UniProtKB/Swiss-Prot annotation:
Subunit structure: Component of the CCR4-NOT complex, at least composed of CRR4 and CAF1 proteins.
Keyword Transferase attributed: no
Role this protein plays: Ubiquitous transcription factor required for a diverse set of processes. It is a component of the CCR4 complex involved in the control of gene expression.
A molecular-function term among this protein's GO annotations: poly(A)-specific ribonuclease activity
Top-level lineage group: Eukaryota
Xref: InterPro entries: CNOT7/CNOT8/Pop2, RNase_CAF1, RNaseH-like_sf, RNaseH_sf
Subcellular location: Nucleus; Cytoplasm
Presence of the UniProt keyword ATP-binding in the record: no
Pfam family, one: CAF1
Cofactor(s), by name: a divalent metal cation
Protein name: Probable CCR4-associated factor 1 homolog 5
Protein family according to the UniProt entry: Belongs to the CAF1 family.
Length: 278
């Protein structure tokens, strides 16, 4: 399904990513990381959500990055294994680590055979700088995905405020950064409350690879995004008679303007008594 990227095949796979980007203008991303050191109440303000996310991302190491490049009839996926996380020494959420292990991540192998985070992002930054033209970045509930990507590309802690974070994301990634979870809320029969797998099930899409592996999750995110764009554009075209490309532009603008922070690390509001999972 995906090209697994390790220390021993890094250069060949990075060259493949560089070549593929010449033909694709869309990238779906997913991250696997050691969970959250601080959990955020569901009713927290945007600034508190951002403060907690910054603390979590600044103090933990990314374990996997999934990249799916797609467009012009091409779809190709890479799963980059990153070696900085040390289970015995690095800060982590024990429940999240157990969850990753139960879903098949071999943390010992990733530690021994993976790529250093700084080494990977130095070359990935160069590859992105070679890309000319607008890029579309696609996430699913993607605040942490964007945050780890930003941390890797800048090789710095996250900005101090959510406003600075949004500005830096736009500066580095451009204006067109989509969140498929939000898009699902615009579609008949779906909801922004649904997880990625449930949305795929409703759309009758079969997963390729294992859930909660960054490569498989990014690939499924890319396919769901493509389907939702197609359905949204065509449904609006039928109802308004406007050209499909005009409708897609409006959707892009709407996605860009939706700045509400979506977090993957939170605790339930006590009065509701409901449990939420990552």
């Amino acid at each position: 399904m995906s090209g697994e990227v390790w220390r021993w095949n890094k250069q060949a796979e990075m060259n493949s990513i560089r070549d593929c980007l010449k033909h694709c203008n869309s990238i779906a991303i997913d991250t696997e990381f050691p969970g959250c050191l601080k959990e955020t109440p569901m009713d927290a303000s945007d600034e508190i959500r951002y403060r907690d996310m910054k603390f979590n991302v600044d103090n933990t190491h990314l374990i996997q990055l999934g990249l799916t490049l797609f467009g012009k009839g091409i779809t190709k996926t890479w799963e980059i294994n990153l070696s900085d996380f040390n289970e015995s020494k690095s800060l982590k959420n024990d429940k999240s680590i157990a969850f990753l292990k139960n879903n098949g991540l071999d943390l010992d192998k990733i530690r021994e055979e993976g790529i250093g985070i700084e080494e990977f992002f130095m070359e990935f930054s160069q590859i992105l700088n070679e890309k000319h033209g607008k890029m579309r970045w696609v996430t699913f509930q993607g605040s942490y995905d964007k945050a780890y990507l930003l941390k890797g590309l800048t090789r710095k802690p996250l900005p101090e405020t959510s406003k600075e974070f949004d500005e830096t994301v736009q500066q580095l990634l451009g204006r067109f950064v989509y969140d498929v979870k939000k898009m699902a809320g615009l579609c008949s029969g779906l909801s922004s409350r649904f997880g990625l797998q449930r949305i795929a099930d409703v759309l009758q899409m079969r997963r390729v690879g294992k859930a909660h592996h960054a490569g498989s999750d990014s690939e499924l995110t890319a396919r769901v995004f493509t389907k939702l764009i197609f359905d949204l554009v065509n449904s609006r075209k039928e109802s308004t008679g406007r050209r499909a490309d005009d409708q897609q532009y409006q959707l892009e603008q709407q996605q860009h303007q939706q700045q509400l922070m979506m977090t993957r690390c939170y605790i339930p509001i006590p009065v509701q008594g409901r449990n939420y999972v990552l």
